Amino acid sequence: MPDTAGLSGPDIINAFVKRLPNNPGVYRMFNSDGGVLYVGKARNLKKRVSNYARGIGHSNRITRMIRETVTMEFVVTRTETEALLLEANLIKRLRPRFNVLMRDDKSFPYILLTGGHRAPGIFKHRGARSRKGDYFGPFASAGAVGRTINALQRAFLLRTCTDSVFETRTRPCLLYQIKRCSAPCTYEISDEDYAGLVAEAKAFLSGKSQSVKDHLAAAMQAASADLDFEHAAVYRDRLAALSHVQSHQGINPQTVEEADVFAIHQEGGMTCIQVFFFRTGQNWGNRAYFPKADSSLGPAEVLGAFLSQFYDDKPCPKLVLLSETVEEQSLITEALSTRAGHKVQVSVPQRGEKKELVQHALTNAREALGRRLAETSSQARLLQGLAETFGLPRAPRRIEVYDNSHIMGTNAVGGMIVAGPEGFVKNQYRKFNIRSTDITPGDDFGMMREVIERRFSRLVKEHGTPAGEVKNPDAFPAWPDVILIDGGQGQVGAVRQILGEMGISDLVTAIGIAKGVDREAGRERFFMEGKQPFTLPPRDPVLYFIQRLRDEAHRFAIGTHRARRKKEIVRNPLDEIAGIGPTRKRALLHHFGTAKAVSRAAVEDLMQIDGISEAMARAIHDHFRDK
């Protein structure tokens, strides 16, 4: 390690260059706060890093980066491909200020047809492929998956209930009554016939849609010829459901079986990359990304960096189509092939259907960026207007809005949504399950106190106070400038008291929003410490903006509450007893009918069930008596 005390900029880089090898590897540049400024890779570390020590020929972005560098770290790799893969991983994990960064890196949802069960179910799946079954996707959004599953339910009558619910059914549920499920749980359909439905669903999702539709059409005609109009109508409805799926897929290529299509457009200092996903010859949707990149970087540089990061934790198809050639395209192709475990082709099509797919993606990229630029301009004006309305020193960069949701105090949750210069920042949303047992059911003050305490205690622990945050004006701040609370003077006072106890009351502006007379929108009253309550003109754009923030917080809190309540509803008391698995639970429910009846049963009655020993019967009996 060279002696680098007191050095920075080109001097520190020169000090490191002297001992660097002529090998491929990855380098990291740090500022005085310990923050990572940049992660780069090189075929030859010594040559690449020495370029930074030269005082001429650098862009303003690189010059700023060099000036702030106070130390560096290096990792030597065996090949340049390894260096590229490591670089992409580190960029996603460390999010360096001067690199091209993906903003929305949420994993893609898939459709899962479960395996290892007599009656496979169809589900939305996100994350590691740990469950046995067949995966289809990726889909661009959860909404696209939901629409597809709904249509497939109507077409193939597959179950969507969890295994635990399936095992405890004693009669068909409502989905069977409305012809959305064939009820394999209660043997309304034989295992053999249900397996046929599953096979048809697999064939459709695997791209054999026409053969499946032909089969259903033939069955419909045969039923009609036999004057079995009831079954003919069922086949007709199933065909309509499949047509509905395909109508939402838009463009479906004839010559492209499996590909991802990337198109980039730059305008107004911003970048949009539109990605379309094609699998089994079907369009599974598209998603627009707005990567953070310096305005001095051209489309080839941004798209190349984006591509390397995009597949860091996602499966790569055999074909990747681009709107233009990227830097180090052959190296990126080799890295993607290594990561995927199969040959990947990366190309810029010049003619034919592939060219049309890229042009379609490019059109969508232009339109999406145009909308984002308009929204960003409008958002900036609204934030400045909010600052003027509420007497803030500057336009807020981060606003947090809190709301609670519960039914008579049960399944209580708190929700926090976040907004900034580019709109809602959904990867910053947080939910809080209310834990305290001391809170009286329905005590909104107590719930808000717990949420605020937990939120800001963790914020201080992880990021320190705003003065201690790493100086990075381009990064989205961790600390809010403003918090909006659903409530009046009492809620604002309670929040100020909590922040005061933590010694941070002067760091955040708290604003309360109380619903107007008769809870009418547009007549809200606003509360701040040291000010009289006030209202805003009904047509004030700032009022509309605050209403949108409040409504989004309300939507998020209610959605979180409903999810928790639904989970609580399907939970069976028998699941809490050690030693009671699906088989014993099914036997108990089949005999007694409900968990409540099981709880009232005597030990002798429990022992009558196959698989329930005396010891297990006493364990069940004691479990309910101890409650």
From Swiss-Prot:
Q: Which residues form the UVR domain?
A: 210-245
GIY-YIG domain boundaries: 22-100
CDD domains membership = GIY-YIG_UvrC_Cho
Q: Where in the cell is it found?
A: Cytoplasm
Sorted alphabetically, which keywords does the UniProt record give?
A: Cytoplasm, DNA damage, DNA excision, DNA repair, Excision nuclease, SOS response
Please give the superkingdom of this protein's source. Bacteria
**Molecular function GO labels:** DNA binding; excinuclease ABC activity
Q: Which Pfam families match?
A: GIY-YIG, HHH_5, UVR, UvrC_RNaseH, UvrC_RNaseH_dom
**A single GO CC term, please?**
excinuclease repair complex
Entry's InterPro entries? Answer: GIY-YIG_endonuc (IPR000305), GIY-YIG_endonuc_sf (IPR035901), GIY-YIG_UvrC_Cho (IPR047296), Hlx-hairpin-Hlx_DNA-bd_motif (IPR003583), RuvA_2-like (IPR010994), UVR_dom (IPR001943), UVR_dom_sf (IPR036876), UvrABC_protein_C (IPR050066)
Q: Which NCBIfam families match?
A: PRK00558.1-5, uvrC
Q: How does it assemble?
A: Interacts with UvrB in an incision complex.
Instruction: Quote the function comment for this protein.
Output: The UvrABC repair system catalyzes the recognition and processing of DNA lesions. UvrC both incises the 5' and 3' sides of the lesion. The N-terminal half is responsible for the 3' incision and the C-terminal half is responsible for the 5' incision.
Q: Give the UniProt family note.
A: Belongs to the UvrC family.
Protein's name according to its UniProt entry: UvrABC system protein C
Q: What species is this protein from?
A: Brucella abortus biovar 1 (strain 9-941)
- Encoding gene, per UniProt annotation: uvrC
